[in-house]
């Protein structure tokens, strides 16, 4: 399971890049409510805190809180590592943005609860697989599409979806490695994998683009 998108901070682009590099496929997605807490060593007060450590996504999701508190953010690999680094530190002016479970695991105090900027803070996680697996009920598909670097080429791709009445629920660009200021496009589309429209799309999309990579069809588990 890997985080691919957050309702506050947007896409986790590094995960998409890793999927492309290692040829993984999405087989399921699910949404999880995410709460962040300010953790520090026992006996530390909020007023003592100057520096806060966490994953980049957690820092982005708590950006307003960090600014209001006048804290200096530091990015680490994940929220659990942030909690451990605070627990292992000799300093009493550092804190972590992490879970209450990590507070218990590493013997930290919860100075403030639920400090994310939005109460409705959800992260979408993808279950990925090296071999391609499509399970019954799959009604969403992720694609990576590269178009020629000239006017109208992206429009031709979008026209394919429009002509087949396939809803695009997400569209984002990412730089193409080794090609300055050229971009690939990630699409999430809403269409049952068994629908004739989907089969037509996959059979003809290559006519409108330079490259189309199929990242998987899946359903979202709520």
Give residue spans per PLM region.
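Domain-level signature for soluble enzymes in the chorismate/prephenate branch of the shikimate pathway
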Residues: 1-222
């Amino acid at each position: 399971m890997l985080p691919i998108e957050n309702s506050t901070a947007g896409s986790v682009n590094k995960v998409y890049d890793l999927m492309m590099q290692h040829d993984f496929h999405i087989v399921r997605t699910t949404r999880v409510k995410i709460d962040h807490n300010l953790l520090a060593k026992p006996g530390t007060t909020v007023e003592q805190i100057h520096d806060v450590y966490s994953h980049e996504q957690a820092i982005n999701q708590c950006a307003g809180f960090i600014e209001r508190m006048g804290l200096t953010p530091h990015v680490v690999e994940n929220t659990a590592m942030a909690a451990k680094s605070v627990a292992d530190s000799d300093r009493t002016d550092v804190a972590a943005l992490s879970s209450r479970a990590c507070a218990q695991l590493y013997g930290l105090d919860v100075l403030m609860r639920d400090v994310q900027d939005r109460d409705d803070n959800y992260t979408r996680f993808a279950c990925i697989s090296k071999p391609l697996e499509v399970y019954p009920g799959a009604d969403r598909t992720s694609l990576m599409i590269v178009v020629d670097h000239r006017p109208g080429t992206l429009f031709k791709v979008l026209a394919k979806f429009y002509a087949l009445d396939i809803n695009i629920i997400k569209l984002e660009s990412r730089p193409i490695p080794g090609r300055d200021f050229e971009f690939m496009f990630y699409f999430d589309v809403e269409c049952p994998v068994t629908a004739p429209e989907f089969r037509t799309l996959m059979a003809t999309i290559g006519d409108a683009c330079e490259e189309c990579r199929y990242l998987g069809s899946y359903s979202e588990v709520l």
